[in-house]
Amino acid sequence: NDTYGIFWKLYDAIPDEELQLIDLTIRMFCDPVLTIDLPRVQSELEKEVGGKVAALLKSGTSAEDLLSNNKFAALLNAAGCPAPMKISPATGKPAYAFAKSDEAFQYLLTHKSEKVRALAEARLKIKSTIGETRAVRFLEAGKNGNKLPILLHYSGAHTHRWSGGNKMNLQNLVRGGELRKSIMAPKGHVVVVADSAQIEA
């Protein structure tokens, strides 16, 4: 096919070291060796879900209201805190400063009103789904004793580093997190973590 033909056109220009990396990358997915500590992942999933439920109960509102910008703004106003605003860099018009990186939103997390703090904390919990979805994907990947397939795209980024695949990028698991700790090496081997945070600096 065309892809196969292109490969052989490029073959002589690809260093042997890169061919070995391509081979290793493919083998990590097609011939996996790592396993998953399923009880540990299940415990982490329950912790994630439980944290959201607790935050919702403390806020005294619903997930639907927290996820809606207009309804969340109304909740803040009702609690005596005007909804923080910013100028949107995309439109140049006023918009709610509800992104977790917005300084004004960060202020809500330390607000003097316990109600306002509870609302802000609950919104953060409800909007953050990565921990929960990753735990579910780990459980799916490791069920029935299956090995953990690691799908990375060789030279997937414009800087030629690997990019994540399979909706489960194992390159950016939370440091010290339970999901990272749930990955187990075969007997006689260990999992070694390498920090690539400055690889493109």
Task: Please tell me what each predicted stretch does.
Residues N1-E178, M184-V190, S196-A201:
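Conserved "right-hand" nucleotidyltransferase catalytic core of DNA-directed polymerases
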